[in-house]
């Protein structure tokens, strides 16, 4: 079967909740996301702004161990690793994970841990 050269691969990015304590309400959105190759996207991790210590972002590919992407500790923190970046707002209680120009190798589960 001949492939259509105009059909762009579809990336599937999963976003799951991982929190240290059941007392903490950490919310992530969206839970799953389908992105066209080359498109940019972002995930949100919301957390209680009180008792903040650190927020961790991980990337987890099937059959591999989770890879630590960023540890966010300071309000206004901005970190970058290639096409992936993250920002932190401890006063409002959220962090964004951005993926610029998505590629097939970005297909993974992205985790936020508080």
UniProtKB/Swiss-Prot annotation:
Assembly information from the UniProt record: Alpha-beta TR is a heterodimer composed of an alpha and beta chain; disulfide-linked. The alpha-beta TR is associated with the transmembrane signaling CD3 coreceptor proteins to form the TR-CD3 (TcR or TCR). The assembly of alpha-beta TR heterodimers with CD3 occurs in the endoplasmic reticulum where a single alpha-beta TR heterodimer associates with one CD3D-CD3E heterodimer, one CD3G-CD3E heterodimer and one CD247 homodimer forming a stable octameric structure. CD3D-CD3E and CD3G-CD3E heterodimers preferentially associate with TR alpha and TR beta chains, respectively.
Signal peptide boundaries: 1-22
Cellular localisation: Cell membrane
Protein name, entry field: T cell receptor alpha variable 24
Pfam families, per the entry: V-set (PF07686)
Cellular component, GO, one term: T cell receptor complex
Function: V region of the variable domain of T cell receptor (TR) alpha chain that participates in the antigen recognition. Alpha-beta T cell receptors are antigen specific receptors which are essential to the immune response and are present on the cell surface of T lymphocytes. Recognize peptide-major histocompatibility (MH) (pMH) complexes that are displayed by antigen presenting cells (APC), a prerequisite for efficient T cell adaptive immunity against pathogens.
Gene responsible for this protein: TRAV24
Source organism of the structure: Homo sapiens (Human)
